C-alpha cells in the first residue's frame, strides 16, 4: 500500500484541487478548470449545509434523507467525473485498478473534511465529522 501511495503522489502533472474536486495541468489553467472551480464552490456550500459529503470510495455522495438541488447534483456529478478521470489516469500503467487510487483519495478526503460535514464510512453509514 505504501508503494501505491508513493505512486499516486508521483503524478505531478495532475493535482486534486481543494478536496480533490478539480483536475488541472501544471502547464496552464483552462476554461474547464474555471467550470470545475464553479462546481467546487457549489459543492462546498452543499457540504456545509449537510446535503452531500465525501465517501470512502473517493467520490462525493448525497447524504441519506437529503434532497440537494439539481445544480448541486450537477456540480457533484461534474466533480465525480473529473475524479474518475484522475483515478483512471493514475491507474494506467500501474498494474492497479482505479478503485485503489479512488479509495486512497477517499481516505484522504475524509481526513481533510471540515468538522460538521458528513462523511460516509466503509460500513456505508453517514456520520457527522
Label each region the model flagged:
Residues 2-23:
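Bacterial N-terminal signal peptides that target proteins for export
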Residues 3, 12-13, 27, 43, ...:
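Exposed boundary/loop context
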Residues 22-34:
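Sec/Tat signal peptide C-region and signal peptidase I cleavage site
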Residues 36-74, 78, 94-129:
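Amphipathic, charged alpha-helical segments and their helix-to-coil junctions
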Residues 75-91:
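Short, well-ordered alpha-helical segments
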